[in-house]
Design a protein with these regions (language model features):
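Aromatic-lined ligand-binding clefts that engage carbohydrates, nucleic acids, or primary amines
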Residues: 110-118
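Membrane-embedded alpha-helical segments of integral membrane proteins
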Residues: 1-12
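N-terminal, polar/Ser/Thr-rich
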Residues: 1, 15-91, 208-212, 226-230
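Asparagine-centered strand-capping/turn motif at beta-strand->loop junctions
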Residues: 99-105, 115
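A surface-exposed beta-strand-loop module
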Residues: 119-180, 224-228, 262
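Extended, low-hydrophobicity, Ser/Thr/Pro/Gly-biased non-transmembrane segments
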Residues: 57, 160-277
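Juxtacatalytic substrate-recognition/specificity segment
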Residues: 94, 141, 158, 238, ...
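Short acidic/proline- and small/hydrophobic-mixed sequence motifs that coincide with surface turns
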Residues: 91-92, 106-108
Length: 318
């Protein structure tokens, strides 16, 4: 409607003979502003259609599947990370380190690390590197340790990345950093070791059109686990900071909570190995607490969403 109204105004100016110097200046300024606004939106909008995504998936698979699927890669055994949440700016910052172990019976001379294109990868480094190559098109790093990793050898890998919400590309519910109610499935965005079969095209007819071989099969619930499983289980330690008024709920035992420089810090430690699946939420919560068989139980909830809290507490005790 705004565009129609503007065009009608332009038509009226010309039709009624109100074509003065001031009108010309106004029209020129309006056109310049419209062009600059359009360019800004285009620059910040990720315009990837389905065809582009399918081409990307095919290219990734063709480049990395044969070369790295089934090839010995190190396993993540321990993650230490610091995560700073800035919900008012809709952004968060992560620094972390992986302890990698060669759990195979083969020598590992190089391995690959996949990073996600939604995040801003800032660094990937180690003191034990001879070479690192980045494939920017696929967010892929090819890493060669200074010395080949013999069976049971370990390797430390350090990384930093940042994520900021792009208002032009919609809301991702698994990566939501918002003012009061953040939820981040962190394991979706941390670097991954090895070939990522979940990035393959899964539609059989689409693969047939592209003359691609069968996709990597998904293991059933009763299938034997790959040994060693690519991630097995990990020890997880995280220091998470958030605005002072917010509470962070995360994976592991809350070892310590303290305030510093108008922010609240939460130190989580899994204490024992957990699957490579971890996340957190942060908001201003109400808390309902109780003790049951010497076990502390706490439920964090939005003050206006308390309808089933008592029922939930009773179910937990059972």
């Amino acid at each position: 409607l705004g565009l129609v109204g503007t065009l009608f105004s332009f038509h009226s100016i010309f039709r009624l003979g109100n074509f003065r110097k001031g009108n010309i200046t106004f029209i020129c300024l309006w056109l310049i502003c419209a062009a600059m606004t359009g360019m800004y939106i285009l620059k910040h909008t990720k315009t990837i259609n389905q065809a582009d995504e399918l081409h990307w998936q095919q290219a990734y698979e063709e480049k990395y599947r044969t070369a790295y699927q089934g090839v010995a890669q190190p396993s993540v055994t321990h993650i230490q990370t610091t995560i700073d949440l800035y919900p008012n700016e809709m952004t968060y910052q992560v620094s972390g380190s992986y302890q990698l172990v060669n759990k195979t019976d083969q020598v590992i001379r190089e391995f690959i690390v996949h990073t996600w294109q939604d995040i801003q990868m800032q660094s990937l480094r180690s003191s034990n590197l001879s070479q690192i190559k980045m494939d920017r098109a696929f967010g892929q790093y090819v890493i060669k340790p200074a010395k080949p990793l013999m069976p049971k050898d370990s390797f430390s890998l350090h990384f930093t990345f940042r994520y900021s919400v792009n208002p032009w590309n919609g809301h991702n519910p698994a990566n939501a950093i918002v003012q009061n109610g953040s939820f981040i499935r962190l394991s979706n965005y941390f670097p991954r070791i090895g070939y990522q079969s979940e990035l393959e095209i899964t539609d059989e007819s689409e693969r047939a059109k592209r003359t691609m071989p069968a996709a990597t099969s998904i293991k059933g619930l009763t299938d034997a686990m790959e040994q060693p499983y690519p991630y097995g289980f990990i020890r997880w330690e995280a220091l998470v900071s958030a605005p002072a008024e917010q509470t962070v709920v995360g994976i592991g035992e809350l070892v310590k909570r303290y305030r510093k420089n108008d922010r609240t810090y939460f130190h989580f430690d899994s204490k024992r190995p957990i699957p490579f699946r971890f996340g957190l939420s942060s908001a201003v919560y109400e808390v309902k607490k109780t003790q049951h068989d010497s076990i502390a139980i706490e439920i964090y909830y939005h003050p206006r969403h308390a309808q089933n809290v008592t029922h939930l507490m009773e179910r937990i005790k059972q």
